[in-house]
């Protein structure tokens, strides 16, 4: 039997060689294998299994630990050691004197009270010692120190029973009734003196069970979204409704930010300023009396920076000021790559609309109904500024009734079972003249009040709008829903007046305007002028200090935010004293008129320059000689018609001049006069061009700039082609 070619193993040394395990052969790159690692588990999963299973230490029969368990400190780590001798062990550590503590405490208190100071970093100081706890010192009752537990209860009690103010249910009822009467008397007195909080005027307390629909914005999910936004944002913008700023302010959230998140900056944005008169938002200082109404921007600026805003993608107000303020914050936080700005507030206050206005496009879904935003959303404004949209939140308050919740725009009106029950409270807040004008109702002496007045006005509105039930009965619930929707969307004029500077015995604005100025009033005005001068001096000194500090530190300084609030265009028309509740001085009025006239003239000049730029250049305007040559020959009649059309259009424009053109005819240059003279020489006929409705009407917005067509003498397409051919031939 012959042998095969592979039969001789000595001849083929590589035949039958067994593959060795990885890492056993010398000179081969090996990895350190973990105990337990095999085909089924890698090193990570093996370590995890070892952690889960190896929770016990290995001990001998005497109970001593032979092998410590995982995550268990052994005896070797706790061996006694020798401390290295050093003089620093006996020296002073970080110490501070009481005088320095008092100085830091007063400085910190002043900076905390200033809403425009920004906390960037906390130094290595004992902040617990620096914070002033005088307000909270008496908050905790020291019961144990006053009466120890052993002296009150137990075998060594010194009295038989605890001292209780109320011993029965009858005494509890009497005490609660007395407390209620005392609270009512206190609120009535505060309202009479004018010291009551405006947010408490329409907020009676209630103890009845509420329907689930009135608990919108208070769910655990929405408040979880709020805390996500607060934790993620460096700047928190609280959006308020200009019609009721204090009513739409989330006081618990503001207090939480002040106490727990002092390093986050709070800014108020007063949205929907186009729905209130300009004097409510703010106004020139010359119009404000010492006892006149304080504007909302000035009032809210005492607690935080406040900006008036009107959210609109095309016609907005306050957009530049808000972006400038956000850029200031980004400059302050120059050590960060970017800052996040969170928008919080009540539902339907315009948070998403403000973000769309800043982006100048629709990036957030918006609707005139509350609850459109469900979850938080990140939007990139620019490279270093991010915006965070938050769903609307409603802080739980015992002062808010169901009607207050509805009138603040928290609840969707179509989901209300009985919307007519909220109309009496609405009638108390709105003047009857506005309802008559909005719904075209007949004038009623004294207006509508109470449930009876609500029934009367709802019946009239239902009949006017055709909302009837079977048998021709007016549908009051449908009419109430319509009124509430108009209220929420701003069609019914309403606003809460800003707080006035109330002083005991001070005269009102009307009496002050009518009466002659006394010596006391003169002293008051002089004192106010001195205060204003001192404030200006201090502001100048602070600005100089900021400039010098910026030069030293090399920090880029950004200008302050200013707003021309007097230029806000109000959408709703208010009556008489609502439109302007301050008395204007004659000199101030004259100055304002001059300023307005100058601004109007500048705007007119800019508009005229834009119109001249927008006018299309014709061929004859650039090459008049060639145009005359082209117009000769076969196209004489057509050119004559075009010339007459041009002249007739000019005549029509001169016959019906606009207000801008009347004031500008004196400023026509001599070159323009020569051009018009040259054009008038070319007129050869008096034929009138036929006109119709579409000549002057603005159909499909094509003729929006002028009453006459923009270029009535423009050649047709065939004419352009012929002139083009002739021009080619000439060339």
From Swiss-Prot:
<feature type="binding site">
    <location>
        <begin position="345"/>
        <end position="352"/>
    </location>
    <ligand>
        <name>GTP</name>
    </ligand>
</feature>
<protein>
    <recommendedName>
        <fullName>Nucleolar GTP-binding protein 2</fullName>
    </recommendedName>
</protein>
<keyword id="KW-0690">Ribosome biogenesis</keyword>
<dbReference type="GO" id="GO:0005525">
    <property type="term" value="F:GTP binding"/>
</dbReference>
<feature type="compositionally biased region" description="Basic residues">
    <location>
        <begin position="699"/>
        <end position="715"/>
    </location>
</feature>
<feature type="region of interest" description="Disordered">
    <location>
        <begin position="517"/>
        <end position="541"/>
    </location>
</feature>
<dbReference type="InterPro" id="IPR023179">
    <property type="entry name" value="GTP-bd_ortho_bundle_sf"/>
</dbReference>
<dbReference type="Pfam" id="PF08153">
    <property type="entry name" value="NGP1NT"/>
</dbReference>
<dbReference type="InterPro" id="IPR024929">
    <property type="entry name" value="GNL2_CP_dom"/>
</dbReference>
<feature type="compositionally biased region" description="Basic and acidic residues">
    <location>
        <begin position="519"/>
        <end position="541"/>
    </location>
</feature>
<dbReference type="GO" id="GO:0042254">
    <property type="term" value="P:ribosome biogenesis"/>
</dbReference>
<dbReference type="Pfam" id="PF01926">
    <property type="entry name" value="MMR_HSR1"/>
</dbReference>
<keyword id="KW-0342">GTP-binding</keyword>
<feature type="compositionally biased region" description="Acidic residues">
    <location>
        <begin position="597"/>
        <end position="655"/>
    </location>
</feature>
<feature type="region of interest" description="Disordered">
    <location>
        <begin position="585"/>
        <end position="731"/>
    </location>
</feature>
<feature type="domain" description="CP-type G">
    <location>
        <begin position="223"/>
        <end position="396"/>
    </location>
</feature>
<dbReference type="InterPro" id="IPR012971">
    <property type="entry name" value="NOG2_N_dom"/>
</dbReference>
<dbReference type="InterPro" id="IPR050755">
    <property type="entry name" value="TRAFAC_YlqF/YawG_RiboMat"/>
</dbReference>
<keyword id="KW-0547">Nucleotide-binding</keyword>
<feature type="region of interest" description="Disordered">
    <location>
        <begin position="130"/>
        <end position="162"/>
    </location>
</feature>
<comment type="similarity">
    <text>Belongs to the TRAFAC class YlqF/YawG GTPase family. NOG2 subfamily.</text>
</comment>
<feature type="compositionally biased region" description="Polar residues">
    <location>
        <begin position="685"/>
        <end position="698"/>
    </location>
</feature>
<dbReference type="InterPro" id="IPR006073">
    <property type="entry name" value="GTP-bd"/>
</dbReference>
<dbReference type="InterPro" id="IPR027417">
    <property type="entry name" value="P-loop_NTPase"/>
</dbReference>
<comment type="function">
    <text>GTPase that associates with pre-60S ribosomal subunits in the nucleolus and is required for their nuclear export and maturation.</text>
</comment>
<dbReference type="InterPro" id="IPR030378">
    <property type="entry name" value="G_CP_dom"/>
</dbReference>
<keyword id="KW-0539">Nucleus</keyword>
<feature type="compositionally biased region" description="Basic and acidic residues">
    <location>
        <begin position="132"/>
        <end position="145"/>
    </location>
</feature>
<feature type="binding site">
    <location>
        <begin position="389"/>
        <end position="393"/>
    </location>
    <ligand>
        <name>GTP</name>
    </ligand>
</feature>
<dbReference type="GO" id="GO:0005730">
    <property type="term" value="C:nucleolus"/>
</dbReference>
<feature type="region of interest" description="Disordered">
    <location>
        <begin position="1"/>
        <end position="27"/>
    </location>
</feature>
């Amino acid at each position: 039997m012959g042998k095969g070619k592979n039969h001789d193993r000595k001849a083929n040394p590589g035949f039958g060689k067994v593959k060795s395990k990885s890492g056993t052969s010398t000179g081969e790159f090996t990895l350190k294998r973990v105990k337990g690692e095999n085909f089924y588990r890698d090193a990570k999963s093996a370590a995890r299994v070892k952690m889960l299973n190896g929770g016990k230490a290995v001990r001998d029969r005497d109970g001593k630990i032979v092998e410590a368990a995982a995550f268990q400190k052994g005896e070797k780590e706790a061996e006694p050691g020798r401390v290295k001798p050093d003089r620093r062990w006996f020296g002073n550590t970080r110490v501070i004197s009481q005088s320095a503590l008092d100085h830091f405490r007063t400085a910190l208190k002043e900076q905390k009270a200033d809403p425009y100071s920004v906390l960037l970093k906390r130094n290595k100081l004992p902040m617990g010692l620096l914070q002033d706890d005088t307000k909270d010192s008496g908050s905790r009752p020291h019961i144990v120190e006053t009466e120890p537990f052993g002296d009150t209860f137990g075998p060594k009690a010194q009295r038989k029973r605890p001292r209780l103010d109320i011993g029965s249910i009858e005494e509890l009822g009497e005490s609660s009734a007395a407390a209620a009467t005392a609270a009512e008397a206190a609120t009535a007195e505060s309202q009479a003196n004018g010291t009551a909080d405006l947010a408490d005027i329409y907020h009676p307390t209630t103890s009845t069970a509420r329907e689930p629909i009135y608990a919108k914005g208070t769910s655990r999910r929405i408040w979880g979204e709020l805390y996500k936004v607060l934790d993620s944002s460096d700047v928190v913008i609280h959006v308020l409704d200009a019609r009721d700023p204090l009513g739409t302010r989330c006081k618990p959230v503001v207090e939480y930010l002040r106490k727990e998140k002092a390093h986050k900056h709070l800014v108020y944005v007063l949205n929907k300023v186009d729905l209130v008169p300009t004097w409510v938002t703010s106004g020139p200082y010359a119009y404000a009396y010492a006892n006149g109404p304080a504007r909302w921007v000035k009032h809210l600026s005492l607690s935080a920076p406040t900006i008036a805003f009107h959210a609109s993608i095309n016609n907005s107000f306050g957009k530049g000021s808000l972006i400038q303020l956000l850029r200031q914050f980004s400059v302050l936080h120059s050590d960060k790559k970017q800052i996040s700005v969170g928008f919080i507030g009540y539902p339907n206050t315009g948070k998403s609309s403000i973000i769309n206005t800043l982006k100048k496009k629709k990036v957030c879904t918006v609707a005139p109904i509350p609850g459109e935003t469900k979850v938080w959303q990140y939007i990139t404004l620019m490279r270093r500024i991010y915006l965070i949209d938050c769903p609307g939140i409603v802080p739980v308050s015992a002062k808010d009734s169901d009607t207050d919740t509805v009138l603040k725009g928290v609840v969707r009106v179509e989901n209300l079972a009985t919307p007519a029950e909220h109309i009496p409270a609405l009638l108390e807040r709105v003047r009857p003249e506005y309802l008559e004008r909005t719904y075209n109702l007949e004038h009623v002496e004294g207006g509508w009040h109470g449930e009876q007045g609500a029934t009367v006005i709802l019946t009239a509105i239902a009949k006017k709008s055709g909302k009837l039930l079977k048998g021709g009965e007016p549908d009051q619930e449908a009419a109430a829903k319509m009124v509430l929707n108009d209220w929420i969307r701003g069609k019914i004029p309403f606003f809460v007046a800003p707080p006035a500077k109330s002083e005991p015995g001070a005269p009102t604005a009307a009496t002050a305007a009518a009466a002659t100025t006394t010596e006391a009033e003169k002293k008051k005005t002089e004192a106010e002028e001195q205060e204003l001068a001192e404030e200006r001096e201090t502001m100048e000194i602070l600005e100089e200090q900021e400039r010098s500090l910026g030069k030293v530190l090399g920090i880029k300084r950004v200008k302050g935010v200013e707003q021309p609030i007097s230029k806000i265009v109000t959408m709703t028309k208010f009556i008489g004293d609502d439109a302007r509740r301050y008395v204007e001085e004659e000199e101030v009025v004259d100055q304002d008129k001059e300023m307005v006239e100058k601004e109007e003239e500048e705007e007119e000049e800019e508009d005229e320059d834009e119109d001249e730029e927008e006018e299309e250049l014709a061929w004859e305007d650039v090459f008049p000689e060639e145009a005359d040559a082209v117009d000769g020959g076969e196209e004489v009649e057509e050119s004559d018609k075009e010339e007459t059309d041009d002249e007739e259009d000019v005549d029509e424009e001169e016959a019906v001049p606009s207000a801008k053109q009347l004031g500008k005819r004196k400023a026509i240059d001599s070159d323009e006069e020569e051009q018009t003279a040259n054009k008038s020489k070319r007129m050869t006929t008096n034929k009138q061009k036929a006109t119709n409705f579409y000549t002057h009407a603005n159909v499909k917005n094509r003729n929006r700039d002028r009453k006459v067509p923009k270029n009535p003498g423009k050649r047709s397409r065939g004419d352009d082609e012929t002139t083009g051919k002739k021009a080619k031939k000439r060339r």
